[in-house]
Amino acid sequence: MDAEADGPVVVVGHSFGGAIALNLAAARPDLITGLVLLDPAVALDGRWMREVADDMYSSPDYTDRAEARQEKVGGSWGEVPDDELDRELDEHLVDAADGRVGWRISIPAMLSYWSELTRPVPVPRDGTPTTLVRATHTDPPYASDELITALEAGLGPNFTLLEWDCDHMVPLAKPTETAAAIRDRLA
């Protein structure tokens, strides 16, 4: 950010990106004028994350594109427009050596990633304007009560909670509302 920005900026982060944004704001408040956290994944239950990691490890790929698509549609991508979902599949689904398909990711890195989501809530410095969007269709929620309580206590009137009627893929399911939340924080 020192190289790319002329000064402090508003940082927007979705899911794990929200965790990164919170950590950056806590470590380098001089770089941040505000945060927009889109269903951030922070301080999640370790048992839940272990289950997710175990599921990924036991079944990291799909028979074909249709199966991968169905898994997305049946999960948190159900509200994402078809063209956006197809773009995701085109860009990130790759052929595996055994004739199956999988996501263009590192499975070992992803298994480690799930444990990162269990870390405690890093609260930005007092006075950091922060908007958190919580997706209400996610159960259990990624934006936990613990996270919201910590931010309310640490930021007071500088914290805004928005609860949206959608699943976890907030920026893709609600692009107009997401853009408005970002514009509001930039103002």
Regions found by a protein language model. Give the residues of each.
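Conserved acidic catalytic loop of the alpha/beta-hydrolase fold
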Residues: 1-9
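Short beta-strand immediately N-terminal to the catalytic nucleophile in serine-hydrolase-like folds
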Residues: 11-13, 38
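Gly/Ala-rich beta-loop-alpha elbow adjacent to hydrolase catalytic centers
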Residues: 13, 17, 21
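Flexible "cap/lid" loop of the alpha/beta hydrolase fold
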Residues: 23-26, 31-65
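Core-facing hydrophobic residues within beta-strands of well-ordered domains
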Residues: 32, 158-159
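Conserved alpha/beta-hydrolase catalytic His-Asp/Glu region
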Residues: 63-118
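Catalytic histidine-centered segment of alpha/beta-hydrolase-like enzymes
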Residues: 164-175
